[in-house]
Amino acid sequence: MDPRSEVLLRQADLFQGPLLIAGAPADDLLGQLPKANAWTWHAGDQAMLDARFAGRSHYGVDVPPVAFEAAVLFLPKSRELAAYLLNALASRLGGGELYLVGEKRGGIEGAAKHLQALGKPRKLDSARHCQLWQVTVDNAPEAKPLESLAERFALELEDGPLQVVSLPGVFSHGRLDRGTALLLKHLDNLPVGHVLDFGCGAGVLGATVKRRYPQSRVTMLDVDAFAVAASRLTLAANKLEGEVISGDGIDAAPGDLSLILSNPPFHTGVHTNYQASENLLKKSGQHLRKGGEMRLVANSFLRYQPLIEGALGNCRTCAEADGFRIYQATR
């Protein structure tokens, strides 16, 4: 069980009424708290929770339409996302109890200071390198629309500026990361057809390809509901058409692809997690059509080339700069 869940269950008597658990991990916490519902923005966690606790877990970027008298927020990595979630929950909890739980190395002590605007916070417990905080919401705020927290910026590309819309919690929120910047310089001679932007984030790669290769069909895939929402906003801001889907890894992707583009993720919250990236590399051949191509950027220290060669039988380095490499392989 997640150590944060274990800290909550040390105070289980507090959580026996109608409860919403935001950012709930895919463990047995709902099994221990029968009147609780979960809200998650991670498609993989949603699939696991829904399989075990059907109808009690809700996926998306908005507070789910369920009744609750108290709420727990599992602190996310992003400060901007934490602020959005605290506001969204507190706006529904006038006079109710809001709890915040997180790891010390994830910044729980600093995040708990944001509870002061809502009432008088107090630390209830500290164990398993985690802390649990509580506040009675005396000053319920007005809910802020998610789009009001969007960061908008323009990327100057060869074929003109691309408008990017990023949301709290999305990778490299409000700016272009170095890996994607390098890959954007090496998008020439791409195969035309069905293109997948894997781990799409704010949709930079997918939108760029759709504009440059308008005859291609673009599908964008991410595990995070906020990334899915941001990618849709980026497409709309540039008057482009594309399909944006949520799913946990390459298994959720369509088949018969002409191209897979990616700056694959290797973090889950504050933890390193290579599983999604390694599955992409190992299973790419199952989703590419014959002659289809995979082109991705990754940190130079990651040993991805042997995995790509094992899956597709070939791999070459197209470019290397700023600690990143671009790999290209063909099925």
UniProtKB/Swiss-Prot annotation:
Provide GO CC annotations from the record: cytoplasm
Top class in the EC scheme = transferase
Give compartment(s): Cytoplasm
Record-linked Pfam families: MTS, MTS_N
Sorted keywords for this record are: Cytoplasm, Methyltransferase, rRNA processing, S-adenosyl-L-methionine, Transferase
Q: What is its EC number?
A: 2.1.1.172
Major location (coarse): cytoplasm
**Reactions mediated catalytically:** guanosine(1207) in 16S rRNA + S-adenosyl-L-methionine = N(2)-methylguanosine(1207) in 16S rRNA + S-adenosyl-L-homocysteine + H(+)
Protein's UniProt name: Ribosomal RNA small subunit methyltransferase C
Identify the gene encoding this protein. Answer: rsmC
